[in-house]
Amino acid sequence: MKKLIVQFTTITLLMSTSFLVGAQRYSFDPNLLVDGNNNTDTSLFEQGNELPGTYLVDIILNGNKVDSTNVTFHSEKSPSGEPFLQSCLTKEQLSRYGVDVDAYPELSPALKNSQTNPCVNLAAIPQASEEFQFYNMQLVLSIPQAALRPEGEVPIERWDDGITAFLLNYMANISETQFRQNGGYRRSQYIQLYPGLNLGAWRVRNATNWSQSGDRGGKWQSAYTYATRGIYRLKSRVTLGESYTPGDFFDSIPFRGVMLGDDPNMQPSNQRDFIPVVRGIARSQAQVEIRQNGYLIYSTVVPPGPFELSDVIPSKSGSDLHVRVLESNGASQAFIVPYEVPAIALRKGHLRYNLVAGQYRPANADVETPPVAQATVAYGLPWNLTAFIGEQWSRHYQATSAGLGGLLGEYGALSSSITQATSQYHHQQPVKGQAWEVRYNKTLQASDTSFSLVNSQYSTNGFSTLSDVLQSYRQSGSGDNRDKIDENSRSRDLRNQISAVIGQSLGKFGYLNLNWSRQVYRGPIPAKNSLGIHYNLNVGNSFWALSWVQNANENKNDRILSLSVSIPLGGHHDTYASYRMTSSNGSNDHEIGMYGQAFDSRLSWSVRQAEHYGQPNSGHNSGSLRLGWQGSYGNIAGNYYYTPSIRQLSADVSGGAIIHRHGLTLGPQINGTSVLVEVPGVGGVTTTEDRRLKTDFRGYSIVSGLSPYQEHDIVLETADLPPDAEVAKTDTKVLPTEGAIVRASFSPQIGAKALMTITRANGQTIPFGAMASLVNQSANAAIVDEGGKAYLTGLPETGQLLVQWGKDAGQQCRVDYQLSPAEKGDTGLYMLSGVCH
């Protein structure tokens, strides 16, 4: 559209010529520009400069685009007397672009009235310079590296706590299984709700679930309710309510109270929270449940074959994840995914601390809730050493931990600690015990190998963890009931546990992952072993995966070997054929299927058919069908699965919602820090962050999963804009705090687009450079070219334009217009003419 406009103007050619000659002087004839009316000042044009004013420009800092915004330029003169345009940038802007403004107090406003003209004096930074490239609409800044903050460091003043809003995430699943032999059926239902409230820097969060299976009645359970906020000057965070103690020094415990600790996400060199990946193999369509500290935190339905769940968000507690896979035929398998905590190693001068006071919060309502307290401190010493100490206390338990960690350079990080604990189980005498722990982790950059190892050695039978001791105290009953309360509470009998995770990139030959864990107990309790080997390979557009998993639980060993292959059909990447082979304890399964996506990956589908050989289901077949939709307002999916003995139907729905001052906005689940995209009145627009998420009919959408305390570019896809909408500035930057919902607001001009030739009542054309806009609406102002033509957007069907080429009454006029279908071209552009009075 704009290319069409250029064809009607010759000023573009003049601009290009002046750009080529640089600073060379040249002259315009005012009579040629304004048809004999020389009231327009062209002295600046004659010297190769443009008129002062406000321009939408790209700001380029040391070769990188850092912003696109309106900048005001005023006229200045060089020492030689040559006029030029000087930008008016603020200290806040320079700080936002990465300049260390606090190191240069002379930057403060260069103009006399600093309140109305807060322009900085860029000359205060030695060797700093600027150049306004008018014809590229670029303000090019050159600032020495010494004047910039370290990469990744962002001033606190730029952190955005976002808007006040109520938010809700929801997940729901219902499945019904029919047993063909006896005609019976079993229904299972599950609802997970995550309501929240953002109020300034405060974040209020809750997790509540309801589950029901078979003849058992439904049960509600609240995993946590808490309020938290950042204390930015201390780079810390305070939490009030129900949460979990950190698991870096002691085993994590759920508590109700107050917690204050540092927030590493606020540090420039932050290390993001570890999020484990849960891998396993389902023999049939199965329900996967994941618990942590006794609380159900995740539930989903997976198809037969290997599964990999990377969207499991733990409680940040450091406690292991207990995974249970419920097969369609009633069988189940269980295993533990260790929540690996990296070695404790800090840089010199870095401090990490955490303070907790409150009461124990067990998942079982029968367990007592005594007061608990915990304090931990770690500090980075010289020589790459880290010292740390911690204390954990309750009515029946006291433990002290101390250790030393070190950064070993190219050899990774290592830490070792010893914990002395005094424990008193219910109706038993106090006992003392010690435990040693060694942690090691390393990433080999050259070979792209990651390795982590955790070894805990319990040297005496008197050592126990706090949660195991407190679980033995019930509000009713007597005796040592710990095994009845939590079958996994065996720290008193645990002698040694070790876990290791190795990841190896093989380049074009794929990726190999190995995870292993072993728990050894005293007495008759058998050891638990878990080993998984996973290999993935991409060959062209096909995908190959080989997995071997062994879980030893009690006296039973489960060994599962799986091979999966996916190959695109017909050269298209949205439809695949698949084959899967699974071998488990003497039985073999072979499955073929097809799956794919459509409608920009919004629709997903799969059809699978399997044959089973070996006991007990030799010769049996099974099949499944799945259909899912990932929409702008949420996700929905349906599943059908059958075998000779059962038929199962299930449905899933999930999504998120935000209530804000402009109303209700629906979307997919809100994952942590988010942005509310605002394009008022324009629906169906996406951003480059996620092409699947479109603005609703009011022009709003939710984009989540942003990293806190980091800058993000939110860019509109202009191809999605309807013909009657135009957005001058299609990108904006946001820098949210943890859990914030920040605004990315865009200002569309909605209405018709027109090229209008404007003449004055005396027959003269409008002076070149005049501004034309709707009366009382300067946002859609257009510049009149030398032929009196102006390109206008956002026009209503009828209206009045104000044309100005000066401040005096004789330097402005008004023109009425009315859009007519006869004046509309094939491209949707109206060709208008009008007389300005």
From Swiss-Prot:
<dbReference type="InterPro" id="IPR018030">
    <property type="entry name" value="Fimbrial_membr_usher_CS"/>
</dbReference>
<feature type="signal peptide">
    <location>
        <begin position="1"/>
        <end position="23"/>
    </location>
</feature>
<dbReference type="GO" id="GO:0009279">
    <property type="term" value="C:cell outer membrane"/>
</dbReference>
<dbReference type="InterPro" id="IPR037224">
    <property type="entry name" value="PapC_N_sf"/>
</dbReference>
<keyword id="KW-1029">Fimbrium biogenesis</keyword>
<dbReference type="InterPro" id="IPR025949">
    <property type="entry name" value="PapC-like_C"/>
</dbReference>
<dbReference type="GO" id="GO:0009297">
    <property type="term" value="P:pilus assembly"/>
</dbReference>
<keyword id="KW-0813">Transport</keyword>
<dbReference type="InterPro" id="IPR025885">
    <property type="entry name" value="PapC_N"/>
</dbReference>
<comment type="function">
    <text>Involved in the export and assembly of PsaA (pH 6) fimbrial subunits across the outer membrane.</text>
</comment>
<comment type="similarity">
    <text>Belongs to the fimbrial export usher family.</text>
</comment>
<protein>
    <recommendedName>
        <fullName>Outer membrane usher protein PsaC</fullName>
    </recommendedName>
</protein>
<keyword id="KW-0812">Transmembrane</keyword>
<keyword id="KW-1134">Transmembrane beta strand</keyword>
<dbReference type="InterPro" id="IPR000015">
    <property type="entry name" value="Fimb_usher"/>
</dbReference>
<dbReference type="Pfam" id="PF13954">
    <property type="entry name" value="PapC_N"/>
</dbReference>
<dbReference type="Pfam" id="PF13953">
    <property type="entry name" value="PapC_C"/>
</dbReference>
<keyword id="KW-0732">Signal</keyword>
<keyword id="KW-0998">Cell outer membrane</keyword>
<dbReference type="InterPro" id="IPR042186">
    <property type="entry name" value="FimD_plug_dom"/>
</dbReference>
<dbReference type="InterPro" id="IPR043142">
    <property type="entry name" value="PapC-like_C_sf"/>
</dbReference>
<keyword id="KW-0472">Membrane</keyword>
<dbReference type="GO" id="GO:0015473">
    <property type="term" value="F:fimbrial usher porin activity"/>
</dbReference>
<dbReference type="Pfam" id="PF00577">
    <property type="entry name" value="Usher"/>
</dbReference>
